[in-house]
Regions:
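Short, small-residue-biased leader/transition segments that mark boundaries at the very start
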Residues: 2-6
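Short loop/turn motifs that connect adjacent beta-strands in outer-membrane beta-barrel proteins
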Residues: 10-25, 79-82, 133-140, 153-158, ...
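Conserved small-residue
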Residues: 114, 131-235
Length: 347
């Protein structure tokens, strides 16, 4: 572990002495390098069950992830420390990132952890706080914070790795969803005109029927295969924010905290995408009424045809993609201090 830090209290400089409303003005920068311990334990070991079967494929050649962090920031306090502002810009580069790399299907081996490349995360954080006692009976405090970060691979083995519905690709986010682009629902006309579908049109039956999700043939080979999958978005939100509010009036006090995240893709699964699955109760809900029906074949229905085996309709695709941004009240508390009343009772 190595670290270097530089800071300067600007408000102590002679040319700042007349700015009396500034209580503290600090500029700082730091750079450090360390090994990353935020990874699963014993990844170098192969684990077997009681029957002698491998359930975790280890890698004895694993090395430490090496993290280099550059941070620059400003701390500002004003008006008798009533208003405080902090700002940080950071860049974190991780060498020898550990990723579970899938083996070829023919090998029959489990995915094994490997050091596959170099990744970068950079962004900024800002916090603003205000607190003031207006009178002996009234106190008020509020703190707001926002952070933004974005990741990308700088280097990775073979420029990309695919593990299930996750893709690791050079120049893209560290972990991205990997699936199909959806283009409404299939109609009988689509099949009559032989639009690209999963499995093609060999044989008397097809793998997809009217009411199934129509997927985009991104590589233009006239059939839908796993090669048509594309990145569908970063698995981690770029924006995170929070707020704390505190207020007191005499013996009455109020506290509240909110937090949330900006845009992040989420995908409907389980009961929503497969209402007849017994694992989730097997009972359709009210929102399933707007599904594709043979008597009303709407290509823009909210849900595909309902079936006990959704098959290809359950694939990860933009059809099930939604915006996962949210704001929530983490807690809210209203209190009353009976200290004065307790003194009277005690007296």
């Amino acid at each position: 572990q190595r670290q270097m830090c530089i800071r300067d209290s600007v408000n102590r400089e002679p040319w700042m002495q007349n700015a009396r409303f500034i209580d503290n003005f600090k500029i700082r920068a730091s750079y450090g390098m360390l090994g990353n311990n935020n990874v699963a334990l014993y990844r170098y070991q192969t684990i077997i069950d009681n029957s002698g079967n491998e359930i975790v494929n280890g890698n004895p050649d694993l090395t430490w992830e090496k993290v280099k962090i550059l941070d620059a920031g400003v701390d500002l306090s004003l008006f008798g420390q009533k208003l405080e502002v902090t700002f940080d810009w950071f860049r974190k580069v991780t060498d020898d990132m550990i990723v579970n790399v899938p083996s070829t299907p023919s090998s029959g081996l489990l995915a094994a952890p490997m050091n596959v490349g170099k990744a970068e995360v950079k962004g900024y954080e800002i916090g603003v706080g205000f607190n003031h006692s207006f009178t002996k009976d009234i106190d008020f405090s509020i703190n707001l914070g926002y952070s933004y970060n974005k990741s990308k691979w700088l280097e990775i083995t073979n420029d990309e790795l695919i593990n299930g519905n996750t893709i690791y690709r050079k120049g893209h986010a560290i972990k991205e969803y990997y699936g199909y682009q959806a283009d409404h629902l299939l109609t009988q006309d689509d099949l009559d005109f032989r639009v690209p579908i999963i499995g093609g049109y060999d044989g008397a039956t097809t793998a997809q029927l009217p009411g199934d999700i129509r997927y985009v043939d991104t590589n233009g080979d006239k059939v839908i295969t796993t090669d048509d999958r594309v990145p569908l978005g970063d698995q981690d939100p770029h924006s995170v924010y929070y707020g704390n509010l505190s207020f007191r009036w005499k013996n009455l006090d109020f506290d509240m905290q909110v937090n949330g995240v900006g845009y992040v893709p989420i995908f409907y699964q389980g009961l929503i995408s497969n209402p007849l699955d017994p694992e989730y109760g097997g009972t359709p809900q009210r929102w399933h009424l707007d599904h594709w029906k043979a008597e009303n074949p709407d290509r823009n229905a909210k849900l595909p045809r309902v079936t006990t085996d959704p098959g290809n309709n359950a694939l990860l695709s933009t059809f099930w993609k939604e915006n996962g941004a949210f704001v929530r009240i983490k807690y809210m508390q209203l209190g009353y201090n009976f200290k004065a009343l307790a003194k009277k009772i005690h007296a």
